[in-house]
Every structure is written in C-alpha cells, then in structure tokens.
C-alpha cells in the first residue's frame, strides 16, 4: 500500500519548489544549489532561478533553470564600500516584475530565496509560501555587536572614533537601507516591514538561518525562525593539472578571495607567502588573471578549486571572511584568516574570532608584514588549531540539508 501511495504521489501530486538566488555573490547561488540537491527529485519538482553568471560552475546542471536578472557583483561591492543603499526602489521594482513573471511561469508550491529581497513583495502578492535563507547575524534577535564597516569616514577618522559614530548612527543607517523595500511594499498594498535593515533581510513566512547557535546566538526567536546549520557548497570543477605535483611536506595554505573579495587580495597574499616555508594552493575565483600573476615556486594557482577538497588538504585557509568559506574551514577543523571588506564579512569573522578559530584583518589597512604575522600566528599557535577542531566537533552534530528537508516537508504537508 505504501509503495502504491508513493507512486501515485510522484506521478500526480509532486510539489514544485522554486529556489531563487540573488547572484551578487557566489555564496547565494551556492547555498541554493546545495539546498536544491537536499530534496528528493522523485518527490519534488525542483527549479532553480538565478542570474546565469555562475552557471558554468555547476555543469552539467541537474535541475530546471530559469534565468533572471541580478545587479552586477561589482555594483553590489561598490555600494557596500561606499555605504550606499544597495537595492534602490527602481531596482527592487524591476526584481518584483521579474519575480511575478517567474512565479506565474513555474507555479511553485514553495519559493526559497537567498538574498532575493523582492520576494517579500512578490511571494505574498501571489500567495506562495516563502522561505528565506539568511545568516543569523542579520537577525534582529541576534545577540551580537556591530563593528564599524570600512567606509570612507572610517578611513579618515580612524576605527576608534569611527566605531563611536557608527554606534550612534547605525539605527538610522539601517532604517535608510530598509526604506526602498518598505516604499515598494506600500505601493503594492502591503504593510511595511519596519525601519530596520535586519527585518528586511529576514522577513519571510519561514526564516532559515544558515548558521549554528553556538557561533551566532539568538534569543526569543519567533516560531517561524529556524537554525538550519551551515549550508556548504563547492564548485563542480575538475582539479587542476598541478594538483598531484604540489609539495606536501610543508604546511599547506589554501587562499581564495571569493567572488566578493578585493581584486588585489590574492597578489598580496602571494607576495607575503613567497619567502615563507609553506605551500600555497589558491583559487582566484575570477578576481585575478592567473596567467599574469607572479607565482613563486611554492605557489600553485587555478581559477577555481573544489573548496572542500582544497581545505581538507590544508592547515590554514585565507579568504574574504564570508560564511561559506569559514564554515567549510571550521567543519574540517582548519583555522581561518579572513580579510574583511564589508559588514557581512566582519560580522561573520567577529564570531570566528570570538571562539578563537581565526583572525580577521580589514583589507583597507593591511600591510604585507601584518599578513605574514597573522599567518605565522595561526600556523604556530595551538589554541587556534584547537579551537577550529572544537568547532568541527560541534558542527559534526548538524545536518543542514536534513533539517531543510524536514522543514520543507512540514511546510508542504
């Protein structure tokens, strides 16, 4: 009887789950791919929608794909660096129009979004249940402090005075960044979410935190807010030809600026490591022309590397401080050196530093000497390795994909 019931469900009433990634960074696309894979295609029709800029990293593509427009990653990074509103009303209106067309075409039973803020309008307008994947440090319920980002005024006034000013103006800045979505919700007859960027980032029927409470604690969470645990992803790319040749007798360091790191990060890391007794394996993630990089004999570079494989062969990871890379490192028990250049990365690395599993450096004030010192500290101080291994032990108890499957099943019952 159970077998007959399952067959009938698969043929006649298979639910459609639509995943929408805001591809301003690779992490948002990657997390949607991981969660899409977590579902059984025999039980669900799975559709992924994204700007196609990262599609080449997931070939052959395993699901139905719908192309949508996303602002360029360079525009996103520049707005963050200048403290400007990232998604203005005009951009969000364009997104909502695209969303509505997409939802009408796919007809999903559930839409899962990663940083697609316009779904806070398009999903309720079409009465489609909406689950948002977001980091817990953006939750209004997170028990955290907010470091001042690297903004033009902090480069002039310094961090101490800049932090005091940021503490005073942050609520007003968060309200300013929340205004476009609230304006557009009113225009569509929906109530405003509130004058707080954190509420805008986390509004959904179901809010799913791609974090663990041991790293990013929250208090008094609403019943529709859930910790998933880390959502990890790696490029579906082949290992480079040099993979079997690089020396493994010295400490191995993996470095990648990611899609949102600064363009000069990898060249500076290479310069810092050129004279050290280490081996560097690196992925430019498209941020540098690898053919033009000066690579000493202890440096091996490719455009992309499977991050899971690279990290599990390394004693240290150097990255932009984003959660996708740091969770992969901590899962493997590897300490992190994070070069942060926006508030998202700083909030994530603040948590990593709090548990002594890594060191954060602001990219706007980094010398080669500082990079060398941080690398030596992380490689030669046992407390960082012990803390990273402790984090790995905690993370081993989490299964974000299973938790997601269970939540989807409850939503679609």
Language model: regions and residue ranges:
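Structural motif
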Residues: 22, 51, 210-212, 257-259
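Short, well-ordered alpha-helix to beta-strand connector turns
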Residues: 43, 62, 108, 204-205, ...
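Short, basic, glycine/proline-bearing loop/turn elements
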Residues: 21, 82-88, 103, 177-185, ...
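Glycosyltransferase specificity loop/lid
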Residues: 2-143, 147-160, 282-313, 317-331, ...
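Active-site-proximal region of nucleotide-activated glycan assembly enzymes
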Residues: 131-217
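Short, solvent-exposed loop/turn segments at secondary-structure junctions
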Residues: 55, 117-118, 137-139, 213-215, ...
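Conserved hydrophobic helix-helix packing surfaces used for dimerization/oligomerization
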Residues: 16-17, 207, 253
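Donor-nucleotide binding loops and adjacent catalytic segments primarily
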Residues: 13, 36, 214-316
């Amino acid at each position: 009887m159970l077998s007959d019931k399952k067959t009938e469900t698969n043929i006649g009433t298979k639910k459609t789950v639509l995943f929408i990634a805001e591809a301003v960074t690779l992490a948002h696309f990657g997390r949607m791919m991981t969660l899409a894979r977590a579902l059984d295609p025999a039980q669900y029709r799975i559709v992924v929608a994204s700007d196609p800029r990262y599609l080449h990293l997931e070939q052959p593509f395993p699901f139905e794909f719908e192309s949508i427009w996303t602002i360029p990653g360079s525009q996103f990074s520049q707005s963050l660096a200048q403290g400007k509103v990232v998604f203005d009303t005009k951009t969000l209106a364009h997104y909502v129009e695209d969303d509505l067309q997409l939802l009408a075409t796919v007809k999903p039973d559930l839409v899962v979004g990663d940083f697609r803020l316009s779904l806070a309008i398009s999903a309720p307008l079409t009465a489609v249940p909406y689950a948002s994947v977001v980091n817990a440090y953006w939750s209004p319920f997170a028990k955290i402090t907010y470091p001042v980002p690297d903004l033009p005024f902090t480069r002039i006034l310094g961090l101490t005075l800049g932090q005091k000013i940021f503490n005073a103006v942050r609520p007003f800045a968060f309200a300013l960044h929340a205004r476009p979505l609230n304006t557009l919700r009113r225009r569509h007859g929906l109530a405003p979410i509130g004058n707080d960027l954190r509420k805008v980032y986390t509004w959904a029927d179901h809010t799913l935190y791609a974090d663990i409470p041991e790293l990013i604690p929250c208090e008094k969470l609403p019943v529709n807010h859930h910790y998933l645990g880390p959502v990890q992803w790696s490029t579906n790319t082949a290992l480079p030809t040099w993979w079997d040749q690089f020396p493994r007798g010295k400490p191995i360091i993996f470095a990648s600026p990611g899609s949102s790191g600064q363009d000069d990060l990898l060249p500076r890391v290479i310069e810092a490591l050129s004279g050290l007794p280490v081996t560097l394996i690196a992925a430019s993630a498209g941020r540098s022309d690898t053919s033009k990089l000066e690579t000493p004999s202890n440096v091996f570079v490719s455009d992309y590397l499977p991050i899971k494989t690279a990290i599990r062969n390394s004693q240290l990871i150097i990255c932009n401080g984003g959660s996708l890379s740091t969770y992969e490192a901590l899962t493997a028990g590897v300490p992190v050196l994070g070069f942060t250049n926006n508030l998202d990365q700083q909030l994530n690395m603040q948590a990593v530093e709090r548990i002594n599993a890594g060191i954060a450096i602001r990219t706007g004030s980094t010398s080669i000497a500082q990079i060398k010192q941080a690398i030596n500290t992380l490689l030669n101080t046992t407390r960082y390795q012990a803390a990273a291994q402790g984090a790995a032990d905690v993370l081993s108890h989490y299964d974000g994909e299973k938790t997601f499957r269970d939540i989807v099943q409850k939503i679609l019952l």
